Amino acid sequence: MTEESLIEYPCDFPIKIMGKSQQGFTQSVLSIVKTYAPDFDDTTLEVRSSRNGAYLSLTCTIQATSRTQLDSLYQALHDHPMVTMLL
């Protein structure tokens, strides 16, 4: 049985990464994202702080080229200790 993708590659694909607001969080996330999406432009990074400033939400819109790329990127982000949640 083959797994059919609902996504047509290449495409712009937003990834939302959340974690506690701490030194090095943004840089760590960007480093991981650039490992799997080397063309990601830092200037397009969207950063939002929670109401009380305890958490950060980063949205990285990458140029996704394959399901394998997305799966690997999500796994690397999920495994990082500073990342609390991914969407």
UniProtKB/Swiss-Prot annotation:
A GO cellular component annotation in the UniProt record: cytosol
SUPFAM superfamilies found in the cross-reference section: YbeD/HP0495-like
Pfam families named among the record's database cross-references: DUF493
Secretion signal, residue range per the UniProt entry: none
Gene3D superfamilies listed in its UniProt record: 3.30.70.260
Superkingdom of origin organism: Bacteria
InterPro entries membership: UPF0250_YbeD-like (IPR007454), YbeD-like_sf (IPR027471)
Transmembrane intervals: none
Similarity comment: family membership: Belongs to the UPF0250 family.
PANTHER family: UPF0250 PROTEIN YBED
UniProt name for this protein: UPF0250 protein NE1487
Organism for this UniProt entry: Nitrosomonas europaea (strain ATCC 19718 / CIP 103999 / KCTC 2705 / NBRC 14298)
